[in-house]
Every structure is written in structure tokens, then in C-alpha cells.
Amino acid sequence: MSEIPEKIFDAAIVGLGPSGATLARLLAVRGLSVVAVDRKKSDPDSGGFQKPCGGLLAEDAQRSLSRQGLSLPKSVLADPQLFSVRTIDLRTARERTYRRFYINMNRHRFDLGLKSLIPVSATVFHDATVRNFSRNENGIFELSVYAEHEEKRVFARTLVGADGASSIIRRKLFPEHKIRDYTAVQQWFSDEQTRPLYACFFDDRLTDCYGWAVSKDGELVFGAAFPREDSSKAYELFRERAERFGFSLKKPVRTEACRVLRPEKMSDFVLGDGNGAFLIGEAAGMISPSSLEGMSYAMDSAEILADILSGAGTLAPEKFPELAEHYRKRSRKLRLKLLTKILKNPFMYQPTLRNLVMRSGIAAERVKIDN
């Protein structure tokens, strides 16, 4: 086992998705010493871990990028760009089209683009995992990291879990914490649709969540989120039913799956232990329970925590309860915003209400296609 000699970082960040990469960038720019551990490789074409995701950047996430003065390079954008969603209830066969303003993108390249903005002053371990961590008698966090084909020990004054739904930081700090979760299953197919599309599917016989299909760079991404029990069987039935609506889903090129959280009450959000460990993004439970959109909350929670840590002066243990309270207060608006999303759920996921909304045509677009 190797050890970073005589180095105690101000912050150790686990996970460099949108939340972790944003936090690492902001802290390093403001002069804090940062070490980060990420499962992804640094080269977009070298394989390795990729976050399963439909790859649509919602308006809230676009605003988060805009507020931070960031833009999207052409290499991140996917073809085509879509301006409406075809919404299908697989049980009733009712369809509507709604206008939407998502950016179609390559999620993996987006994540790596955010990582590339982290200043070189930060120490970043790519293609690496945290195997364990503890706090020593001086209040310093000790992380056991597997990186560069060996075990390393890393030391930091604060620890931030930005490692998503299956966060090792959250699981170890709060082993009894329970939050509603689902399995998202997604497959990629050769896109044989006659027209590019973004589609959204509902079928309350299989899930109280939703499914999606997105044309992306010559492929069709098709997926859905299910309660974890029998998710594979539910996905196959879901896919079969979608095929009846003209979708070509016979020969998947690859299959992905991941855990996804779905908060339903304030206690589902866990911000940290009050003693120098913090959680941001989906690791903290910050993901929309209606749309499963999490990128905006990831970047926004990271921005809040960056302000708190960088403005703290000395990161001493006696200050940690105060910093935790500041994070709780400043993130309250974010958490309340997430809880208001629950109010949308009956109109999206309760079959009778959804059928009434779709039948009424409220907010639906009239689509005329000339062949």
C-alpha cells in the first residue's frame, strides 16, 4: 500500500459526476487542496465505467450550467436535437405529443467534460474506487483507494460523497437509512425508426415510474425504471409492449442497468454526519421523484457546499457542526423544490388522472406529418 506522503487534503471527493466534478472545480479554483476518486477513465474512448442515462439535459440543468458560466462543446451534443416528446400509455394505447426543451447529448462525454475543467492543482484518481474509509483520532479521514493497480491511503479534513444512488459514503455513515429505490434498465439498438424521436411510456401494470426512448447518433436508447424486485422480467414485458407501437427493439447492441433513488419525504435527504462528512447530488437523495432528473440538483448542491467550505476559513473539527447547519439551511430550498415534484406524480403516474389529462389534450401539441 502506498501513501500520499505528508499530505492532508482539505477535501476528499468520492465520485466525479456532475456533483463531484462541480465541487472539485470550485474548491480547487478557490485555493483549497482537493483529492478526488472517480470510477470513470479520463479518455472517452477507452471504455470503463459509464453512467447509464438517457442523456437529455433538462432546462433546470441548463440553467445551472448558465449560472456557472459553462457551455457545451459540440463533441458533447448528440444528433438529432428534439423539441417534443411522444407520450404513450401502453395500457390504454392513448398517445399525446408535448413540447419539451431538452438538449440531446452524450452523457459520458458530458461527465468527462466537467471532469476536464477541474484545475491541475487537484489530485484526481481515474478508474479508481474507494474500498473503505475511517476517521482517525485527530479527526482526519483516511481513505483506502484502489488506483493505478495498487492500494493507496489518502488523508483529508473533510469527506464528500458524490457517488450517486449506491453511495459507499452514505451506506457506511448511515447503514440504517432507507429510501425508495428502483432499477433503471436501458438498452441501445440500431435506430431503425422512420423519424428521430423522444418518447415517454407509462404502464402501471409493470411500474409506477416511466420508460423512455431517445434517438441518439444513429442509435435508439430504450429504457425504463422499475421496482427492484423482478425488474429484468418487467423490462422484457415493457419492451414487448412498446414494440406494438412500431418501435424496433429486437436486437440490443448493449444493455445497462443502475440503481436510481426516488425520494418521497424530507427525511429521505441525508446531507452528512455533522462531523466533516457531506453528501451532495443523488448520494444525498437529491433527484426528482417525478422525472428522475438529477443533474441540476447535483450541480446546485455542489455549488452550495463549495460556497460553505471555501468560505469557512480553517476546516477544523470544531467548525464542522456549524458548516453542516449552514449546508442544511442553504440546501433547504433545493429539497423543498424536490418535494414539490411529488405533487406532479398523481397526474403522471396515477392511471385515472393520467388518462384524464391525456384525454383532455391540455398542453399537448398538434402534430402534422407530411409523408
Language model: regions and residue ranges:
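C-terminal helical "tail/cap" subdomain of flavin- and related membrane-associated enzymes
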Residues: 307-371
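Redox-cofactor binding/interface segments in oxidoreductases and associated redox assembly factors
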Residues: 14, 161-162, 279
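A short, Lys/Arg-enriched amphipathic alpha-helix followed by its capping loop at the start of a domain
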Residues: 23-32, 64
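Beta1/beta-strand and adjacent pyrophosphate-binding region of the FAD-binding site
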Residues: 3-19
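FAD/FMN-dependent oxidoreductases across multiple families
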Residues: 132, 229-305
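Conserved FAD-binding catalytic core of PHBH/FMO-like flavoproteins
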Residues: 165-239
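Glycine-rich FAD pyrophosphate-binding loop
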Residues: 12, 28-51
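Conserved N-terminal helical subregion
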Residues: 63-172, 178-182
